Amino acid sequence: MDTIQIKDKKFTVSIKEQDILKEVTRVANEINRDLAGKNPLFLSVLNGSFMFTADLMKNITIPCEISFVKLASYQGVSSTGVIKEVIGITEDLTDRTVVIVEDIVDTGLTMQRLLDTLGTRNPKEIHIASLLVKPDKLKVDLNIEYVAMEIPNDFIVGYGLDYDGFGRNYADIYTVVDLSLIHI
């Protein structure tokens, strides 16, 4: 499908599944190399990162654990600026190597909140793996070590990303057709 309709918006394919999977495999290989012997805890940020996490973990070959956290800062097509932790972290992170797995880093505010929260639990080190990063939109300085792709400031759906809860199920990533209609 080259074009999809979700609610009142039309989207066109911008990143094909095979290109996504190639970059996810590259990121997994980097993590395998860098974190060998550290038994990392992968902390997947739901809901958006579920596809990225699944494909990433299929390619992680080092001993590891995985858990999930749910934070929210989006409503519709733009960040609300209000970050609310919905599902907390139950694991003991003391002296652990943690890898945050995120679908997209936009402003970075949600990621900074998560880093602050994790930091109070005394991990040995925290790494960030993100499928997508919008470098021109970042408002905070973050060390995102594992980035599959950098993208422009477009509104996108698919591969776990949604528009008001819809569109997460698509294997490709789609960009809204007329961004001028949306105020991000």
Report the location of each language-model feature.
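PRPP-associated nucleotide enzymes
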Residues: 1-182
